[in-house]
Amino acid sequence: MLKRRLPALLLALLLLAAMAFPAAAETKPAAEDALQDTARYLHDLVAEPTVSGLGGDWTVLGLARSGLPVERAYYDGYLARAAAYIAEKEGILHQRKYTEYSRVVLVLTALGQNPRSVGGYDVLSPLFSFDAVSRQGLTGPAFALLALDSGGYDAPEGLRQQYVDHLLAQELEGGGFALSGVVADPDVTAMVLQSLAPYGAQETVAQAAERAFARLSALQKDNGGFASYGVECSESAAQVLLALDAWGLPFDDPRFVKNGHTAAEALLSFWRQGQGFVHTAQPDQSIAIVSCEQGLLALAALHRRQEGRGSLYTMTDACARFPELSGHPARQAVEELTALGVISGMGDGTFRPDAPLDRASFCTMAVKLLGLTPRWTDRFDDVAQSSWYGGYL
């Protein structure tokens, strides 16, 4: 019976999704122009991308998540060079900086590739070492969570919660986060918020996020921008936009509009047509590739929101290609709902379309379809707050 009814159920969900996810308010033409212009600039500048924290992985990630047309040969070239690099390094990308693994996992996931088999090596499993990852401070666990959750990858039981708890323990008095000191930094606070978004159903996470967003709002300048270490820069505005994106908040959330100016407007003030983004607005500033890459990621998030697609780091639309659905009547509905971030696979590369649908999964899909915010209650004795479905019931 389930086999006969699954396509109809998924079709009904897809129709509901069309109603529940209206297109976001039209992004200003300048944002679309900046997206296409910056994508073109980086594509030409980084002609042969490879594994690199600058002018490599982030460029490929931004292009892949933008949804703009890019020739497949560009991505295939990156994958070939990445595989060769990883093989040359014998799978050891760095002894201490485990963000190297997270970054590569994010790019591979965006390209629909399996990070557990690249050049004969597994670049996902190093993120399973809590001690090694957490030695890097806040950025290690934050990006490990982004990488693990980007494709819904299986991980050792309790590992994700360890990372979440580690991040929460670093919260500053009054809210927010910083790599050092007692003053919240907008970039770091925004990055941590991005990584915690999937865990917003946990009360402690939700409360920390509320304080962090309040701190970011207080840090916002009158022109809509943000300053990191006393310098107003494009990267700070970009990261705050990505935090709003991750939590599904409006980019013009009233808390982030100062004197009529938004973070998106502030970001665009750093854009130079035909050249990408500058780091600061000083007249003598030259184009900085890191500014271009982070600007591209934020603009891609804006673009995806406008098209009603999932957030930048929710990559089930890219990674979920299920071979067993070939010829299955539910294939198209599954792929479209996956692209919307409503459903995902089993975490092992399969979808199992004829498996029973449990109540936890159904409630999760319904909440996502209706655009509701997950919220934990203790109504059910057999549901743990830390469970992936706890906030959806």
Protein language model features and the residues they cover:
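Bacterial N-terminal signal peptides
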Residues: L10-A18
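Feature responds to low-complexity, polar/acidic, surface-exposed segments characteristic
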Residues: S129-D131, E173, F177, E203-A206, ...
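Terminal, non-catalytic domain-edge segments
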Residues: E26-D37, A266, T280-A320
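Sec/Tat signal peptide C-region and signal peptidase I cleavage site
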Residues: F21-A25
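Bacterial N-terminal signal peptides that target proteins for export
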Residues: M1-L10
